[in-house]
Amino acid sequence: MAPPRWHHDRRRMAIFVRVGLYTLLFLMGYVVPLIIFYNRSRADTFEDTPRSGEAFISDENFFHCIAERLSYKEQHPARIPYVLIPVTMDYQDIKQLFCNITVPMTYIMFINNGMFRPLRSLLDRLAVDLRDYVDQNLFIIHHPENIAYASAVNEGLRHALNFSVAKVPWVFITNADVRFAPGLIDEFVSQANEKTQGQLERIRRLDQEIIAEARTLRNVPNRRFAFRSSQHPIITASSLPYRIRTMPPEEMKKQFADTYGIFYTDHKDFMATFALSRLAIATVGFFDENYYPAYGEDHDYVWRMAALGYQKYFSEPGKFVHFENANLNVGGSARNRGIFKNTAYFLQSVKFGRMNYQPFRLQYRRAKWFPDGVTIYQDTGRNPLPFNGTIPLDMWVLDTDRRRSIWEIGENIRCHRDYKPYSMKLLDFPVDPS
């Protein structure tokens, strides 16, 4: 017997109700927030608030602090020769930083990574207010596409290398989310100046050795160890000779054991704020840009320095503060008052969070330093040389396809599962025997 008509009507009505509820949920949970975020992102809602316990610093006071730091003569004995600071969403932090450091600075380089419009506006207004310093002592570069931390530092280092060793004997590289106790930076500058004396002559001797290599090196077992490049995808240091590149790890560690290469404002190996000597940059090379978008490039650089035997300078404990993961936690206090109050921070931090997926970073780190290790802690199971010594210590080979895949994940163009791991085939590049 056919079911009653009212039974069919109830089933149809239930289907309509479910479809309607699903549609409503979709609109409320996806479309409406998108519209709100779109409208608010156009307005770029933003609150310029200091961290808890810190005094508010206005934009005008920040401009004054920068001008005061740059107003001293470059021969000032207590100066920081070159300040390199990559920034992304560090609006109030950069103001606190430059008003917290009171020593003279000869050159300041801001490299702005990302599309955080409030910060772009601040730096644009800084350039207008300090127009007499721009491209003389003050340099500002914008990368709305976000070239990542390692690439930003490398761009700043290349710029710093345009100055003589006498003018820039070391480069001061810092995050914005750091603070210093009175007297810390003064002592740091004094120690860095003292411990980098005499490096110019050593760089000169190494460069002469490399020039001679071009005439004397023939039929070497692995020509990659005689290869040099300053262009992507293969980057090498300028002044590490073949003789040192091919040494066994035990012998290599002795080469710079009498030399300070890195200086920390912290009392331990922590690269939130540090300085590199010109000799270290010339021999260790540039930061590995395969660590993308951030984190891991610092350990990699320290391990390469350790392989060459460089000494480290540490500051006294208790005088340095770092607010860790500031880019991931930025705007936390405002988020507590409602996420829609902080759209400018939120959209940028979400994109960074998608890109900064831990398995992406650990895959390359393991391949380079821990191919046989069960763990990938700093001092457990790490090989003494990158890629087990198959390429020179100072060399890295950029995998542009891998970087592109991570960027597309950040832009929500690609899913995490479609990530492209680092291609080890890139290390086996051909070298022209001529």
From Swiss-Prot:
It comes from the Eukaryota. Pathway: Glycolipid biosynthesis; glycosylphosphatidylinositol-anchor biosynthesis. InterPro entries: Nucleotide-diphossugar_trans. Gene3D superfamilies: Spore Coat Polysaccharide Biosynthesis Protein SpsA, Chain A. One of its GO terms (cellular component) is endoplasmic reticulum membrane. It is a single-pass type II membrane protein. Glycans are attached at N39, N100, N162, N388. Its EC number is 2.4.1.-. It is an enzyme of class 2 (transferase). GO terms for molecular function: glycosyltransferase activity. SUPFAM superfamilies: Nucleotide-diphospho-sugar transferases (SSF53448). Keywords: Endoplasmic reticulum, Glycoprotein, Glycosyltransferase, Membrane, Signal-anchor, Transferase, Transmembrane, Transmembrane helix, Virulence. The chain crosses the membrane at residues 19-38. It is found in: Endoplasmic reticulum membrane. Residues 1-18 are cytoplasmic. Residues 39-434 are lumenal. One of its GO terms (biological process) is GPI anchor biosynthetic process. PANTHER family: GALACTOFURANOSYLTRANSFERASE GLFT2 (PTHR43179:SF12), RHAMNOSYLTRANSFERASE WBBL (PTHR43179). Glycosyltransferase that may be responsible for the addition of galactofuranosyl residues to the nascent lipophosphoglycan (LPG) chain. It could alternatively be involved in the synthesis of the galactofuranosyl donor. Belongs to the glycosyltransferase 2 family. This is Galactofuranosyl glycosyltransferase. The gene is LPG1.
